[in-house]
């Protein structure tokens, strides 16, 4: 325990600097109370950083645009739908957050147990249903403080284009899916330019890998990050055995 903590070094290295042979998990008692809530709105501004980050009882915060809802055969009259899971040991904590939400300009739908199970199951179906189409998937991330502005400008790009958006609102991770687009590269480039504008990343949870190496080159801080990674790679895997085509040219 007195040695340097190398755990962070391996996070996000995508198998280029080592591999995991054993995992030890800490578990926590289940919370006494759990509620799922669906918020629907045309204006994401109501979900500012304060609301997203200042509540420890939000265990999941998922965004589905109206196209994703329609894909699930759920009628949506709003541009954005936000599915929350709230957990607490004190029921009053959940009631307090819901009271705060009631003051926002959103439709609030408290889901019963059956409805909650159905909605969370459907949320997991979205990427599966989209994978059945001719889809190009972008896995981007922007700072939570910039997420609302980013999504507002992304809507302008979406106009008259078959683009689906869903993702993890709490950490700024948005999956942007282009469907049946014969001329998709200009749209992809436009989305990446927008991501750079808000100091975002071309990779959130699915890594840079091989396909996005050329995209990563154009993002802020790339040269310094690449130089550091290259140095670490050389010291830990000088023969380039692990993930030889990931990250590096």
Enumerate the predicted regions with their spans:
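Conserved mixed alpha/beta core segments that line enzyme active sites in large multi-domain catalysts
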Residues: 1-14
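C-terminal substrate-recognition/cap domain of FAD-linked oxidoreductases
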Residues: 11-13, 19-190, 194-198
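Short secondary-structure capping/turn micro-motifs that flank functional sites
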Residues: 67, 117, 211-212, 249
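Activity-critical C-terminal alpha-helical subdomain
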Residues: 212-249
């Amino acid at each position: 325990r007195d040695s340097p903590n190398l755990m962070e070094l391996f996070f996000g290295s995508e198998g280029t600097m080592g591999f995991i042979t054993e995992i030890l998990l800490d578990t926590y008692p289940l919370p006494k109370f759990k509620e799922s809530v669906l918020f629907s709105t045309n204006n994401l501004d109501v979900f500012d950083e304060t609301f997203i980050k200042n509540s420890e009882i939000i265990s999941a915060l998922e965004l589905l645009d109206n196209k994703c809802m329609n894909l699930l055969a759920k009628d949506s009259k709003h541009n954005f739908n936000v599915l929350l899971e709230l957990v607490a040991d004190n029921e009053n904590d959940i009631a307090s957050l819901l009271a705060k939400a009631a003051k926002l300009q959103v439709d609030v739908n408290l889901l019963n147990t059956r409805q909650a199970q159905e909605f969370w199951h459907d949320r997991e179906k979205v990427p599966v249903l989209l994978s059945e189409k001719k889809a190009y998937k972008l896995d981007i991330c922007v700072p939570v403080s910039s997420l609302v502005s980013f999504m507002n400008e992304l809507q302008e790009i979406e106009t008259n284009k078959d683009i689906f958006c869903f993702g993890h609102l709490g950490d700024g991770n948005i999956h942007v899916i282009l469907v049946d687009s014969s001329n998709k590269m200009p749209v992809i480039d436009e989305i990446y330019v927008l991501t750079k504008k808000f100091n975002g990343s071309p990779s959130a949870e699915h890594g840079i890998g091989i396909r996005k190496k050329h995209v990563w080159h154009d993002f802020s801080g790339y040269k310094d990050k690449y130089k550091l990674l290259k140095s670490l790679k050389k010291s830990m895997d000088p023969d380039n055995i692990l993930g030889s085509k990931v990250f590096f040219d």
